[in-house]
């Protein structure tokens, strides 16, 4: 994925857990007319912290381990996408996002796994081959590395 902010590295955003649901479909829209809006996992986390838990942006930014300004950009993007989907009768899908490095500290005892956030498919990670270069054999969506998310207690 190309970095839209050339020269600026993308940093890991900490999320508490992966979303349990990865797609929302509008009722009454013919399948041929369905359009997708894709929310990244960090955008969903920003919505959860700011809108569901009612956290101030500065506190939510600290929890996600990003700057206040970055949090503001993430939440603005997420709200715009959700509004577009609701007003336009579009499907909301939650997929990967702008996560470029492992947020985990230390070595994991569990074997590395590539997962599909769309359908939940899992496959073993092949060392030296990024998960994002593979597609899910069930739904065709991009796979991501399961260890890309850190848990916040």
From Swiss-Prot:
Top-rank lineage group of the source organism: Bacteria
Annotated SUPFAM superfamilies: Sigma3 and sigma4 domains of RNA polymerase sigma factors
Disulfide bonds: none
UniProt-listed InterPro entries: RNA_pol_sigma_r3/r4-like, UPF0251
UniProt cross-references to Pfam families, sorted A to Z: DUF134
Stated family: Belongs to the UPF0251 family.
PANTHER family for the chain: PTHR37478, UPF0251 PROTEIN TK0562
Name of the protein this chain belongs to: UPF0251 protein CT0950
Origin species: Chlorobaculum tepidum (strain ATCC 49652 / DSM 12025 / NBRC 103806 / TLS)
């Amino acid at each position: 994925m190309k970095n839209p902010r050339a020269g600026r590295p993308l940093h890991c955003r900490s999320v508490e857990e992966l979303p349990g649901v990865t797609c929302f479909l509008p009722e009454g829209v013919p399948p041929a007319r369905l359009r997708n809006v894709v929310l990244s996992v960090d955008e969903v986390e920003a919505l959860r912290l700011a809108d569901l838990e009612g956290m101030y942006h500065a506190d939510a930014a600290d929890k996600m381990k990003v700057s206040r300004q970055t949090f503001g950009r993430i939440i603005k993007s997420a709200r715009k996408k959700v509004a577009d989907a609701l007003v336009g009768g579009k499907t909301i899908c939650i997929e990967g996002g702008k996560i470029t490095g492992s947020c985990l500290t230390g070595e994991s005892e569990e074997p590395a796994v590539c997962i599909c956030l769309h359908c939940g498919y899992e496959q073993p990670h092949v060392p030296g081959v990024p998960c994002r270069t593979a597609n899910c054999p069930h739904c065709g969506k991009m796979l991501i590395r399961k260890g890309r998310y850190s848990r916040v207690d």
